[in-house]
Curated annotation (Swiss-Prot):
Coiled coil: none
Pathway where this protein functions: Phospholipid metabolism; phosphatidylcholine biosynthesis; phosphatidylcholine from phosphocholine: step 1/2
Residues the record lists as Phosphoserine modifications: 315, 319, 322-323, 329, 331, 335, 346, 349-350, 355, 360, 362
Record-listed phosphocholine binding positions: 122, 151
Subunit structure: Homodimer.
Phosphothreonine, modified sites: 345
Species: Homo sapiens
Gene3D superfamilies documented for this protein: HUPs (3.40.50.620)
UniProt protein name: Choline-phosphate cytidylyltransferase B
């Protein structure tokens, strides 16, 4: 593994080039005892001042190409990332994830600046330094947390923590009288860029809170915080509490409206179902009625059958013309049928003439007999 030559150091004390001379035998015999990357996530990451690293092996510098090819298991690539990490959010976590996955075998050290340095160079923070330290310890990508990290990285700090590379976004970070606090790191070939996550930052979160300050103040008053704790005046406190009562009434009215709408919808659904069932029953009833009492219904057919039976029972059958009884008595002739012809008679002129005509008619009858 190449070692650093003393003649290739820049003015800042950071080595700029690497020699290809093989290490001496004494250097190979000494094993690395530096902390290894965390294999389990059941405990938070340790602080740098608690690890007590006593590794005596010389820390040989690596190029980015060598680090990407991979290193021995006992020689992880030590990557450093620093920041304020106020209101730790997903953008911070993604940046640390990128720093952790830059190389196959990496050990991620995260430096967190103290409150004094942050308030001096950047401004007031929402979380204090202890809270920010703890937030970083519980990030799964972090192997070690360095408290009170320097604002500008010095050669002594890099050598103390045996840092191979520094990971940060490539945007120049002007602060502390410098156009870019990572300029000397970039010149030394130790800078590895990461990508920022758009749409999320600590400043954006604070802007949301300030924009909706009244909403959050009312919410916290409702949850039991006092006006003194929220730094709210007496008048604003009463206004917020009154607004909370108004919102409660609005919520109740809204709930009643929603319930009434649900009730109306249920009634409409049930009435619709009821109407459908009633229509089905009506169609069934009408169909059954037509089948029974319609023009070709069963009732009419039954009435016709009964009527025909009654007619057959009431009217006897006529005997045929050539019946046996008529053939047995051939001598008997049917009685003659007489047709009375109309006679024109003049009215009798006298009672005697009328009696004479009647007597003549009776005599004629006796002669026929």
């Amino acid at each position: 593994m190449p070692v650093v030559t003393t003649d290739a150091e820049s003015e800042t004390g950071i080595p700029k080039s690497l020699s290809n001379e093989p290490p001496s035998e004494t250097m190979e015999e000494i094993e690395h005892t530096c902390p290894q990357p965390r294999l389990t996530l059941t405990a938070p990451a340790p602080f740098a001042d608690e690890t007590n690293c006593q590794c005596q092996a010389p820390h040989e510098k690596l190029t980015i190409a060598q680090a990407r090819l991979g290193t021995p298991a006992d020689r992880p690539v030590r990557v450093y990332a620093d920041g304020i990490f106020d209101l730790f959010h997903s953008g911070h976590a993604r940046a640390l994830m990128q720093a952790k996955t830059l190389f196959p075998n990496s050990y991620l050290l995260v430096g967190v600046c103290s409150d004094d340095l942050t308030h001096k160079f950047k401004g007031f923070t929402v979380m204090n330094e202890a809270e920010r330290y703890e937030a970083l310890r519980h990030c799964r990508y972090v192997d070690e947390v360095i408290r009170d990290a320097p604002w500008t990285l010095t050669p002594e700090f890099l050598e103390k923590h045996k840092i191979d590379f520094v990971a940060h976004d490539d945007i120049p970070y002007s602060s502390a009288g410098s156009d870019d606090v990572y300029k000397h790191i970039k010149e030394a070939g130790m800078f590895v860029p990461t990508q920022r996550t758009e749409g999320i930052s600590t400043s954006d979160i604070i802007t949301r809170i300030v924009r909706d300050y009244d909403v959050y103040a009312r919410r916290n008053l409702q949850r039991g915080y006092t006006a003194k704790e929220l730094n709210v005046s007496f008048i604003n406190e009463k206004r917020y509490r009154f607004q909370n009562q108004v919102d409660k009434m609005k919520e109740k009215v809204k709930n009643v409206e929603e319930r009434s709408k649900e009730f109306v919808n249920r009634v409409e659904e049930k009435s619709h179902d009821l109407i459908q069932k009633w229509e089905e029953k009506s169609r069934e009833f009408i169909g059954n009625f037509l089948e029974l009492f319609g023009p070709d219904g069963a009732w009419k057919q039954m009435f016709q059958e009964r009527s025909s039976r009654m007619l057959q029972a009431l009217s006897p059958k006529q005997s045929p013309v050539s019946s046996p009884t008529r053939s047995r008595s051939p001598s008997r002739s049917p009685s003659p049928t007489f047709s009375w012809l109309p006679l024109k008679t003049s009215p009798p002129s006298s009672p005697k003439a009328a009696s004479a005509s009647i007597s003549s008619m009776s005599e004629g009858d006796e002669d026929e007999k």
